[in-house]
Amino acid sequence: MNKETQPIDRETLLKEANKIIREHEDTLAGIEATGVTQRNGVLVFTGDYFLDEQGLPTAKSTAVFNMFKHLAHVLSEKYHLVD
C-alpha cells in the first residue's frame, strides 16, 4: 500500500462493507460479509459462499467471491484494522 490508511474497528468496517454490497449494482440477495481479517495490508472478507450439499461452489458462490474481492480492493486502500 502506497497511501496512508485510516484505522477502523472490525464492526464499523463490516457495516461499511455490507452497505457497499447492498448498494452495488451487481449484488445478489443474501450476500453479506460476516467477518474480516487483515493479511499483509489486505482486508480479507468472509461470509456464506453458498456451497451446495457436497460443499461445491454454485453460481452464487462466484458472485460472493467477486464481491468480497471488490471489497478487499476498495477498502484496503482506505483502512487498516484495529482491535
UniProtKB/Swiss-Prot annotation:
InterPro entries: DUF2498, YciN_sf. Pfam families: DUF2498 (PF10692). This is Protein YciN. The lineage of its organism: Bacteria, Pseudomonadati, Pseudomonadota, Gammaproteobacteria, Enterobacterales.
